[in-house]
Amino acid sequence: MKRSLAFFFAVAALAQAPNPDAFYKLGPDSLPQDGVPKGEIRGPFKIDSKAYPGTFHTYWIYVPAQYDASIPASLMIFNDGQAFMNPNGDARAQNVMDNLIYRREIPVMIGVFINPGHTPEQPEPTPAEWGDRTTNRPTEYNSLDDRYPRVIVDELMPVIYKDYSISKDPERHGIGGASSGAIAAFTVAWERPDDFRKVLSIVGSFVNLRGGHAYADIVRKSDKKPIRVYLQDGRNDNRGVRGDGNYDETRDWFFQNVRLMKALTEKGYDVNYAWGMNKHGQKMGGAILPDMMRWLWRDQPVSTDPKDAAERSFREPVKKN
């Protein structure tokens, strides 16, 4: 009887515990605003992959209203593109770019939303199914090798350069993602810093799915690279408790994100981080996506005219060391 009562109260306590994700809500910079020009999302488009023979990648292009082909734009790529561009999702990156570009808090940029690769027989990832069990996502995103960087730099970028006026300056190229898409973004910049130097990571899977927990040690042992990183994670992310109840720190998302942050800090990287109470997903990362973008793209000069009604951040451009 005592055991039954204890079990009942434990279940009742869990049922009444607040959902930590419920604290995170999208703010005005993540929602359409009156008077803010809307960019256009074009696509879907497809490219065959040589890095992963037999697969192809689907992607969409965000073109801001302020885009001028005579002026090279910056570039921001989002892995798991379908999730980041979902108009009812937790990130709504196209709205964020609309608002921040209009406010001149980030530069005019082309956005690319790219999905994991898959074979013709496999389904396209969706907001409900990101493709972990149905596409090439685990191999592409979680592997610490140069194949996915080749997809982005050698397969996707030439097509984007052909169709749009984009700066060749790697300081003006960013890439981001969530979960496995976040570690994939880090891998692209780590392997190809001459092409990408800004990384946005939401609940990054820097864990032992395919050796990702090694990144903290790799960072410490490697020469410093010219990349800027913003990490976000939460204390209620997957915490490394195996099915048998044993704890495995190499599978603890929050622990490994903190380890990576410390390693980057010790090496003198331009790194920022935000730790919250969120579970695994985009809830907190989506809510703070505007701030993450502002910080990553804080290099450009902005207006200091007090009569400028659009500009709202009176900062000077970041000085290069």
Q: Model-flagged regions — what are they?
A:
Residues 1-4:
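Positively charged n-region of N-terminal signal peptides that target proteins for export
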Residues 7-16:
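Hydrophobic h-region of N-terminal signal peptides that target proteins for export
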Residues 16-321:
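Non-catalytic cap/lid and distal C-terminal segments of serine-dependent acyl enzymes
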